[in-house]
Amino acid sequence: MPGHGLQARGIAREQKMIYAGMTLFLEQGYGRTTTAQIARKAGMSPASFFAAFENKEALLLRLTQIMFRSQFSRAEKMLPADQSPLLLYAMETGLQLHIAECSEPLRDLYVTAYSLPSTSDFINRSMTPRLRQIFSRWMKRADDSELFELELASAGVTRSYMSVPCNMYFTMERKIRRYLSCCFRIYCVPEKEYAPYVERVLQADLHQVAENIVAETVQNAAA
């Protein structure tokens, strides 16, 4: 049927744009990449981009959705099913810091995702229901609005820590330790309860996991 053919071509065009966009974002960052470059990388005319996505931010939103699913899924697979939700939160967010540290284009991509309206809204609204599952023990009276407001705070902390590169003084260990301390305090978790999980995260080889997630995401986008 003609309608199915058009739909299939639209999906194929979109997938090509996603792969081309991800490739260019990883090479040169979000800010330096244009929609025309993405379209040419996909083997299409510059105008073809807008048949697939409204703008570059819409493409980044799709990539943000893909990356977040990948990192959360990987963190869950690293831990036993009955593991503490605090450790899962620490592992997920620590992994995210490692992904942003893999390269400067990735840092730019993640910081931008936490900054633009549609992508940051997706992140905040996706995280809010997870917060109830993770922190309900310490925030029993918090309703959804309060959790959303606190997610805005922890997302701001996340963006700030991702935006600053590690160096010989501000090591990855110091970054993760301070970052997780800030986030757990936002959700009223006592230090004696979260401290052991911070140490577990620091002992994990999250940098290798982060590189694998990026490689697998690119590979899946090409499929």
Positions of the model-derived regions?
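Generic hydrophobic, amphipathic alpha-helix propensity
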Residues: G10-M22, I38, L63-M67, Q71
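Amphipathic alpha-helical packing segments from all-alpha helical-bundle domains
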Residues: Y114-S163, R174, R178-S181
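Extended, charge- and Ser/Thr-rich helical segments
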Residues: M1-A12, M22, G31, S45-A47
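Secondary-structure edge/capping motif, primarily at the C-terminal ends of alpha-helices
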Residues: A75-L79, R107-Y110, Y161-M168
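C-terminal peripheral helix-coil segments that are non-catalytic and often amphipathic
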Residues: R132-R137, S163, N167-A223
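Hydrophobic alpha-helical connector segments
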Residues: R62, S73-L106, N124-T128
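Helix-turn-helix
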Residues: K16, L24-A58, R62
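Short, hydrophobic secondary-structure boundary micro-motifs
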Residues: R107-T112, K192-P196
